[in-house]
């Protein structure tokens, strides 16, 4: 009994109209062998596979088992060799204990005031609820058929307006630069203070 056998179907003869058309620089092709699986011709084209479930007219089909080289150029083997690795459980146990003690020491070092803990939990839960509500609103607005397209048109219109207002001419670019610097001073404060 063989462990690794392979059953392949080989086309040994194609119709005479296919042979000798001069596709291979004038040399006639007498015999073409294609590996098939259960009378289904398969040709691999980059990312797609073409399959033909019917037999070619005038073909002769033979079935044979093979234990030699398969269609990928890899030799089939009769047995499987598995190498078992021995793990040294004694050296892994202290490492796991060290990691656990480091994690516990880190958690013991964290000290939270009760006043700050409540405010942090309140802000965190409020942020999670706000994120959930925002995603629900956005998904409901996307369900309206015309709304996303309308928002795209509004965005393109604003982009065109901003470009013509501030970026097209030099005096307008300088005006934008002064407005940005004023806003920076308001937010960050002036350097002289």
Swiss-Prot record:
It comes from the Eukaryota. The keyword Transmembrane helix applies. InterPro entries: CAAD_dom, CURT1. Keywords: Chloroplast, Membrane, Plastid, Thylakoid, Transit peptide, Transmembrane, Transmembrane helix. Residues 139-142 are lumenal. The keyword Zinc-finger does not apply. The chain crosses the membrane at residues 118-138, 143-163. Disruption phenotype: No effect on growth behavior, leaf coloration, grana stacks or photochemical efficiency of photosystem II. Curt1a, curt1b, curt1c and curt1d quadruple mutant shows disorganized thylakoids with extended stretches of unstacked membranes and broader stacks made up of fewer layers. One of its GO terms (cellular component) is chloroplast thylakoid membrane. Residues 1-51 form a transit peptide. Coiled coil: none annotated. Belongs to the CURT family. Homo- and heterodimers and trimers. Determines thylakoid architecture by inducing membrane curvature. This is Protein CURVATURE THYLAKOID 1D, chloroplastic. It comes from Arabidopsis thaliana.
